[in-house]
Amino acid sequence: SEKAGLPAEEAEAYLKKGYSLNDRVGTSYLEKQYEETLQGKRSVKEIHLDKYGNMESVDTIEEGSKGNNIKLTIDLAFQDSVDALLKSYFNSELENGGAKYSEGVYAVALNPKTGAVLSMSGIKHDLKTGELTPDSLGTVTNVFVPGSVVKAATISSGWENGVLSGNQTLTDQSIVFQGSAPINSWYTQAYGSFPITAVQALEYSSNTYMVQTALGLMGQTYQPNMFVGTSNLESAMEKLRSTFGEYGLGTATGIDLPDESTGFVPKEYSFANYITNAFGQFDNYTPMQLAQYVATIANDG
């Protein structure tokens, strides 16, 4: 506002651009991102005074112009419905105890053909007070462990690096490395070992298919109770993350909002971190990144 003036931490930068201390500027969201577009341009005038200090004439050196308008791709009615849906769902989960320790709930809807953002919705849950607050910006600033949704990208990495061929069949089985606890899929104890294709691995959400694919990126083939050499660990993680990045995971999405997070992709990691990353349990991504990932699949890349 004019009363508040320029934000103190950014005042110097704005003054260098010709702003005045009492100018009104955008401080968040799209208003901040498009400040120069929305602000317009002031007229520059030259005032001539007589020897007594009285104004004699005014010459316009530069004509001013109004700021431009921007049109959002977000559909207000749809945005409101998504907001209401999240609120209803999260309150229901709180009531039955399912969201007691949840930090909140977020949703993004994109047009996969154009990339247009149709809705960005979020609810932040304060774990200390239980308070719920709207947090749409959290869809681009907050990061989360994605879980099984990344499995399609893991299989893509297998194809891209020659580890998998087409709808390749592997054995879905309990994975046991020397000196480590078993890694299972959610159904392993009930069904034991059986052959599974790449498509079925996605359909059933197989963890062990992803582990074997990740092991293949290291140049190794799974054998029960095997010793895993880690000389190729770094290059294998680079391959996996490179494919993830092609889907927009761990990279800037290019959305026109300030302060976008590119995710949390630790530089230091162990073999266990790498293996679990193959089924979405290490690197962290924003809801917007995950939406872009799914949109990439939806529009056939």
Q: How would you name each of these model-derived features?
A:
Residues 70, 74-78, 87-91, 136:
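Helix-start/capping segments and mature chain N-termini
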Residues 48-65, 74, 99-147, 153-301:
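Beta-lactam-recognizing serine transpeptidase/beta-lactamase-like catalytic domain environment
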Residues 13-14, 33-41, 85, 212-216, ...:
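Residues that form generic nucleotide/phosphate-binding pockets
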Residues 18-48, 89-92, 96-119, 240:
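Carboxylate/His-rich catalytic cores and anion/metal-binding grooves
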Residues 1-67:
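Small/polar-residue-rich segments within soluble enzyme cores
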